[in-house]
Amino acid sequence: MKLPYQSSNRSRSLFASLTIVTAILILASRSLVADKPNILYIYTDDQSDRTVSSYERSQPWVDTPNIDRLASSGVRFKHAYNGTWCMPARATFLTGKLQYGVQSMRMEGDYPGSEYDPKKAPFWMSSFKKAGYTTAHIGKWHTGTDTGYGRDWDHQIVWNRPKFPENSGNYYDNQLISFNGSEAKMTKGYSTDNYTKWATNYIEGQGRDGKKPWLLWLCFAGTHGPFTPADRHEGTIDPKVNIPLPTDIFGHRPGKPQYVKK
């Protein structure tokens, strides 16, 4: 993807302060019966549908051929809405309930601390396990220190932000990663590359029962502001691309501090 430079001021960014689901991509394996396809669910932070070229509203400078290929054989969400904050949005996805209907989910402790009671807020992945699926989660986690490994996920490689507040700002590298419930270890490398590698390994058969259909929730963090691309993209980003700023629906915010008005 070729991206122009973005303003560090998130209120002036096209991405605003949203956590959205870009696509659900359902990939059916020829070896499985039609009613139990493999499921790859890609979930990203702070990303507009205008930055995925398979969507009609995408900006002319966007080019995402790999995602487009997946979307062509899967499903795109074109008329859907999710909450605008990390934890509530994930709570909705994991439970299938509106944010205010998710019992026990709460912010607790230092940001981004959060907790929940799995008995009061069960995740629907457990139903897939009962239906014969093997389940996996790879990437960012921001829904309580309990990541659900062993209960909801058979396989998990996780960056647990609530558990490690001191590491919660490391969206792009040097993340504390736990592999299948093990002690978290500092992990080098660009997070998007790491998550993609681990997801590819899982899809190709590592860490799962090859006789079962699989469900993988893949949560990328690298699209989160302040938008720091991998070093290899140096020189591919055109600083002259003109990006029109969206209309501010809140106006000039009279009476608010200067930093809010910006």
List where the protein language model places each region.
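N-terminal secretory signal peptides that target proteins for export/translocation
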Residues: 1-13
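Short, low-complexity segments with poor structural confidence in diverse proteins
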Residues: 5, 28-30
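N-terminal export leaders
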Residues: 13-15, 39
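Bacterial N-terminal signal peptides
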Residues: 16-28
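Formylglycine-dependent sulfatase
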Residues: 30-262
